[in-house]
């Protein structure tokens, strides 16, 4: 199986299966000399970790990360960094009944047809559990980008099912299990309780941002920053759509309002999402993703088995009624990995480039000039 490595200069190779002994990744290209410990990574893994509330899967994995290589005396050495996360709470017997059946909405059918074999336990390689190593790698990228550029990556849920979530403050996001930017999440909790009792699932919309991004990241024509971001986000399990900036709202906007006017003190708006012509403009990167409803539900559904016989599929096991609830740190990590890759690329080619443009005195802190 190919397609397991993300990035080139900051390359992350992901390995493992949902119910295997362990999952992990190898990071190749991390600059040397950065202080790094498991504690620097564990915080983001804890944000993504299952079993943290009644609204997510009750699979109880500690997701404790181990650094196996690439760090000496507390600092990165420039050699590959191997990160390992043990699987400790597998319950493979839950998947015995569906081992020869294809669950609607899952990768079962396509994996079987492509490879002629599949691991049905927890989805095997197609499981969202494999996002944990990417969150770990993203934490490494976040740390380097924060230290070198002061970059800040944040995310929140802006919609769950039919419920739009108003933005109140970033301060509310870590205080509730939904990563919602609002103080009172009782409506969201009641909605999820009803959904779970009905044996159904729902989708979600997640917003992620990156602040203090330098101007100049992105490589036209085909490695544009927004193209790479979309590629990364679509690599997250269950993501079905990506928006940059105004996204689909651009359809109803006019050119007189969509184009972000520029003044001596900076941009007036950010409909472009911080990217112009595939290159970062210095504004915040603004990205939203749409996540489909969880495919693993207890309600019976029509399908076939590996012999093409009609079957009624009832999925057992422990599953997220909305995978979007834990997707915020995943989307943050993937955005950080894209930015890390392009910072290294831009430094290699354009590190000595200087222009006559001066930084506007009262421009936002995101609009830094290289």
Curated annotation (Swiss-Prot):
Top-rank taxon, per record: Bacteria
The pathway to which it is assigned is: Metabolic intermediate biosynthesis; chorismate biosynthesis; chorismate from D-erythrose 4-phosphate and phosphoenolpyruvate: step 7/7
User: Which reactions fall under this protein's catalytic activity?
Assistant: 5-O-(1-carboxyvinyl)-3-phosphoshikimate = chorismate + phosphate
Q: Name one GO biological process term.
A: amino acid biosynthetic process
EC number(s) reported in the record: 4.2.3.5
User: Bound how, and how many: what does the cofactor note say?
Assistant: Reduced FMN (FMNH(2)).
PROSITE patterns to which the protein is assigned, alphabetical: CHORISMATE_SYNTHASE_1, CHORISMATE_SYNTHASE_2, CHORISMATE_SYNTHASE_3
So which cofactors does this thing need? FMNH2
Pfam families referenced in this protein's UniProt entry, alphabetically: Chorismate_synt
Q: Where does FMN bind?
A: 125-127, 237-238, 277, 292-296, 318
**Binding annotation for NADP(+):** 48, 54
Top-tier EC class: lyase
Which terms in the GO cellular component ontology are assigned? cytosol
Question: Which key words tag this protein in UniProt?
Answer: Amino-acid biosynthesis, Aromatic amino acid biosynthesis, FAD, Flavoprotein, FMN, Lyase, NADP
Gene Ontology MF, one: FMN binding
Enumerate the NCBIfam families for this protein: aroC, PRK05382.1
Subunit info here reads:
Homotetramer.
The text of the family note is: Belongs to the chorismate synthase family.
Q: Which purpose does this protein serve, as stated in its record?
A: This reaction introduces a second double bond into the aromatic ring system.
The molecule here is called Chorismate synthase
Q: From which source organism is this entry?
A: Variovorax paradoxus (strain S110)
């Amino acid at each position: 199986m190919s397609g397991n490595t993300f990035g080139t200069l900051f390359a992350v190779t992901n390995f493992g299966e949902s119910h295997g002994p362990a999952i992990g990744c190898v990071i190749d290209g991390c600059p040397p000399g950065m202080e790094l410990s498991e504690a620097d990574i564990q915080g983001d893994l804890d944000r993504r970790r299952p079993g943290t509330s009644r609204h997510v899967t009750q699979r109880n994995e500690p997701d404790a990360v181990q650094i196996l290589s690439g760090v000496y005396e507390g600092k990165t050495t420039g050699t590959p960094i191997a990160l390992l996360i043990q699987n400790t709470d597998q319950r493979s017997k839950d998947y015995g009944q569906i081992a020869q059946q294809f669950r609607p909405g899952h990768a079962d059918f396509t994996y079987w047809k492509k490879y002629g074999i599949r691991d049905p336990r927890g989805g095997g390689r197609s499981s969202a559990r494999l996002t944990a190593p990417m969150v770990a790698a993203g934490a490494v990228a976040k740390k380097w980008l924060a230290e070198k550029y002061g970059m800040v990556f944040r995310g929140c849920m802006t919609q769950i099912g039919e419920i739009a979530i108003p933005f109140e403050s970033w301060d509310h996001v870590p205080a509730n299990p939904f990563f919602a930017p609002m103080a009172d999440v009782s409506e969201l909790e009641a909605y999820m309780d009803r959904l779970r009792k009905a044996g159904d699932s729902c989708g979600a919309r997640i917003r992620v941002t990156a602040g203090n991004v330098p101007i100049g990241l992105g490589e036209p024509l085909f490695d544009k920053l927004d193209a790479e971001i979309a590629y990364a986000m679509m690599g997250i399990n269950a993501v079905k759509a990506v928006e940059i900036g105004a996204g689909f709202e651009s359809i109803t906007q006019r050119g007189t309002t969509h184009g972000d006017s520029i003044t001596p003190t900076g941009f007036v708006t950010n409909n472009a999402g911080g990217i112009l012509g595939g290159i970062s403009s210095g504004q915040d990167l603004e990205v939203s993703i749409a996540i489909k409803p969880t495919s693993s539900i207890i309600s019976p559904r029509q399908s076939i088995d590996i012999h093409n016989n009609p079957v009624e599929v009832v999925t057992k096991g422990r599953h997220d009624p909305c995978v979007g609830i834990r997707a915020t740190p995943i989307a943050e990590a993937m955005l950080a990995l894209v930015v890390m890759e392009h910072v290294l690329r831009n430094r290699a080619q354009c590190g000595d480039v200087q222009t006559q443009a001066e930084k506007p005195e009262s421009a936002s802190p995101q609009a830094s000039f290289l």
